[in-house]
Curated annotation (Swiss-Prot):
Keywords: Glycosyltransferase, Lipid A biosynthesis, Lipid biosynthesis, Lipid metabolism, Transferase. It catalyses: a lipid X + a UDP-2-N,3-O-bis[(3R)-3-hydroxyacyl]-alpha-D-glucosamine = a lipid A disaccharide + UDP + H(+). HAMAP family: LpxB (MF_00392). Condensation of UDP-2,3-diacylglucosamine and 2,3-diacylglucosamine-1-phosphate to form lipid A disaccharide, a precursor of lipid A, a phosphorylated glycolipid that anchors the lipopolysaccharide to the outer membrane of the cell. Transmembrane segments: none annotated. SUPFAM superfamilies: UDP-Glycosyltransferase/glycogen phosphorylase. It comes from Syntrophus aciditrophicus (strain SB). One of its GO terms (biological process) is lipid A biosynthetic process. It is an enzyme of class 2 (transferase). GO terms for cellular component: membrane. The lineage of its organism: Bacteria, Pseudomonadati, Thermodesulfobacteriota, Syntrophia, Syntrophales. This is Lipid-A-disaccharide synthase.
Length: 383
């Protein structure tokens, strides 16, 4: 295969992580292949020429979309133009459908094959997108087992490749080693706080979590908190957010997120991929979700699933308590964490349920299987 050029777009932190694994697997098979597009620190480290940072593209809710719309449209225009000028051999799209589907349409017009890795959550809302995807995407790799039959029924050339988190989610140190590394006590109850990877959701949810931490401090003596931060966020900004609340015993962690979560006795986690990561590490958790009132109202009318947390969606039942919108308040969060920590039998039952999730997510090696699919698509387009 001659030197090929691939446009890859990952607009969120999880897509950046999984995209980097995919790029690595493709380069391992075809060392001369080149990539450009949108991503974060992981895709940059993997060698992708970034035209925009995923941190500037990630949004939650209508109000955040409005504030970033101009910049997002500018980036989209540049990428569409690049298809005409650079003529990439393949477009790889990772989730992020409101941005990626218009790009897929442009790729189709320019005769460029489209590989979609990690499905938009059409099973939760906007199922009409299935028809759109069927007409625009040449090949799709999905990471949840129930997605494959859904897309196949819609006429999409789809394969379930397993969940990429199975290859990356693991602690590298024991609980005691991790706590010592962070300068914390090993004999103290530890709670992890995961407020998300997008600045907007962190602004909205971190103050609530920190108030809950203060309530927990009043009820558990002693207790300490680990706050792993996403690499999409600025450390100085995060420290400022924490300082405003002035909570006791909160340690901000950069890097070693999986070690930090695995070392915790319980975790408060914003809805999203982080709930599945926490579950795979075996840490009992509660899921919180909060957006603007308008976004929530519209979402209630459109969303057709019983759960908001990915951990519960995959399990098919409530494994982790969910606190949504008004229920995601400091008092309720603290009460749910106290219930987990104060009832050893309940905590053990949750951990047992979490241990079964891994079996539902397929086998390790998702990126390698997806890489073969993507490279095959490039070779087909050469014929």
């Amino acid at each position: 295969m001659n030197s090929k050029l691939v446009l890859i777009v990952a607009g969120e932190a999880s897509g950046d992580l999984h995209g980097a694994s995919l790029v690595g697997a493709m380069v391992k098979r075809e060392p001369g292949i080149r990539f450009y597009g949108i991503g974060g620190v992981n895709l940059k480290t993997a060698g992708v020429d970034l035209w925009a940072d995923a941190a500037d593209m990630a949004v939650v809710g209508l109000t955040e979309v409005a504030s970033k719309l101009r910049g997002i449209l500018t980036v989209m225009h540049r990428l569409k133009k690049s298809m005409q000028l650079l003529k990439p051999d393949l477009v790889i799209l990772i989730d992020y459908p409101d941005f990626n589907l218009p790009l897929a349409r442009s790729a189709k017009k320019n005769g460029i094959p489209v590989f979609y890795y990690i499905s938009p959550q059409v099973w939760a809302w906007r199922k009409g997108r299935l028809r759109t995807i069927s007409g625009l995407v040449d090949r799709m790799a999905v990471i949840l087992p129930f997605e494959e039959p859904l897309y196949r029924q819609a006429g999409v050339d789809v394969s379930f490749v397993g969940h990429p988190l199975l290859d990356v989610v693991q602690a590298t140190s024991s609980r005691d080693e991790t706590l010592r590394m962070f300068g914390l006590r090993e004999d103290v109850t530890t709670v992890a706080l995961l407020p998300g990877s997008r600045k907007g959701e962190v602004t909205r949810l971190l103050p609530v979590m920190l108030k809950a931490a203060r309530i927990l401090t009043e009820n558990i003596c002693p207790v300490q908190f680990l706050l792993p931060m996403a690499n999409t966020l600025d450390e100085t900004w995060m420290k400022d957010q924490i300082a405003k609340a002035d909570p006791p015993g909160v340690r901000l962690i950069r890097g070693a997120t999986y070690d930090a979560v695995a070392a915790a006795d319980a975790a408060v986690v914003v809805s999203g991929t982080a709930t599945l990561e926490t579950a795979l590490l075996g840490t009992p958790l509660i899921v919180i979700y909060k957006v603007s009132a308008l976004s929530y109202l519209i979402g209630r009318m459109l969303i057709s699933v019983d759960h908001i947390g990915l951990v519960n969606i995959v399990a098919g039942k409530t494994v982790a308590p969910e606190l949504i919108q008004g229920a995601a308040n400091p008092e309720r969060i603290a009460a749910e964490i106290l219930a987990i920590l104060g009832q050893p039998d309940r905590r053990k039952a949750i951990q047992e349920e979490l241990s079964h999730l891994r079996d539902k997510l397929g086998l390790p090696g998702a990126a390698e299987r997806a890489a073969v699919m993507a490279l095959t698509l490039i070779k087909k387009s050469d014929c």
